[in-house]
Amino acid sequence: MKTNYEIRYAAHPEDAKSYDTARIRRDFLIEKIFVPNEVNMVYSMYDRMVVGGALPVGEVLTLEAIDPLKAPFFLTRREMGIYNVGGPGVVKAGDAVFELDYKEALYLGSGDRVVTFESKDASNPAKFYFNSLTAHRNYPDRKVTKADAVVAEMGSLEGSNHRNINKMLVNQVLPTCQLQMGMTELAPGSVWNTMPAHVHSRRMEAYFYFEIPEEHAICHFMGEVDETRHVWMKGDQAVLSPEWSIHSAAATHNYTFIWGMGGENLDYGDQDFSLITDLK
């Protein structure tokens, strides 16, 4: 197995508005998440979130404590949320064993233990996407499925944004220090998410897009309300959203995305909305 990581530094909005396409993609887009028998991570300076993925194909992959953590184990001072977006898989955390099927999630609290990822079938490997944030105390590990989620049905087919927001790793379902994660599924014929757009200066966010055909693409919108920019994305890619940025998208096909947040509070509804007509 191989572990790869990179550090992404935070940007001031006054600087970011001058970025060209290449710089925007380099600073905010995370293209390489799933590579066979690799664990790939981005250590972001936005609330020190780690965004990553593991794709075990015939090997057991270990979540290693990368150097920026300066810790004996990855979870020594961190909590994490994991989603399986591939075939059936297994996550082991110390002596605990969790089987995760497609679109099932797992919360792991902080503590010194080894975490491993494996697939049940190498011909249909599991794909583990994860977010991790710093934690001030330990909370119990827990597997969470859509049956456990707080579900909000939003939008309409007429508005091209009919979707179910599955709030899964949130404080309405289980205790966390600062991590919140969920999964939004767009209905066939709907392509817009998070519109009207909002920001939440108390929390940063990361979006991971999947379930979109290879010949289609997602156009993710970011930036300040009056200085928006776009990032064209494919499936199985993620994008960082600073606390000062909107985070919305339209695509050429319906899709699903996993959102993860961390920062000042655990209030999902703490959002500052903008009128669609105010976007520039």
From Swiss-Prot:
Domain of life from the UniProt record: Bacteria
Cofactor binding description: Binds 1 zinc ion per subunit.
Pathway participation: Glycan metabolism; pectin degradation; 2-dehydro-3-deoxy-D-gluconate from pectin: step 4/5
Catalytic reactions on record: 5-dehydro-4-deoxy-D-glucuronate = 3-deoxy-D-glycero-2,5-hexodiulosonate
CDD domains per UniProt: cupin_KduI_C, cupin_KduI_N
Positions that bind Zn(2+): 198, 200, 205, 247
InterPro entries the record matches: KduI, KduI/IolB_isomerase, KduI_N, RmlC-like_jellyroll, RmlC_Cupin_sf
Gene3D superfamilies in the cross-refs: Jelly Rolls, pectin degrading enzyme 5-keto 4- deoxyuronate isomerase, domain 1
Keyword terms, alphabetized: Isomerase, Metal-binding, Zinc
PANTHER family noted in UniProt: 4-DEOXY-L-THREO-5-HEXOSULOSE-URONATE KETOL-ISOMERASE
Protein name: 4-deoxy-L-threo-5-hexosulose-uronate ketol-isomerase 1
Species in which this protein is naturally found: Bacteroides thetaiotaomicron (strain ATCC 29148 / DSM 2079 / JCM 5827 / CCUG 10774 / NCTC 10582 / VPI-5482 / E50)
